[in-house]
């Protein structure tokens, strides 16, 4: 699992969303969300922005992790 996928899964679960529920918010398939979380594929920049909006986080939380962003430790 890549960093974005791991962070995506963590943030999705924190919001108590299923993959299906997140997929509906983004108008994509559940399989797309699963592929991002497992690292089989990576969301493009536009999708990263939509994910951040759907999860109500800064896009950097998806890239660097919510803990790093909360501590101000991102580059």
Give the ranges of each region predicted by the language model.
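Short alpha-helical DNA-recognition segment
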Residues: 16-35, 50
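Short, charged recognition helix plus adjacent turn
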Residues: 63-75
């Amino acid at each position: 699992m890549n960093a974005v996928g791991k962070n995506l899964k963590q943030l999705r679960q924190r919001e108590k969303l299923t993959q299906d529920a997140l997929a509906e918010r983004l108008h994509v398939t559940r399989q797309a969300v699963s592929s991002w979380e497992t690292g089989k594929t990576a969301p493009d920049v536009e999708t990263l922005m939509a994910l951040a909006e759907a999860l109500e986080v800064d896009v950097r939380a998806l890239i660097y992790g919510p803990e790093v962003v909360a501590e101000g430790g991102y580059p």
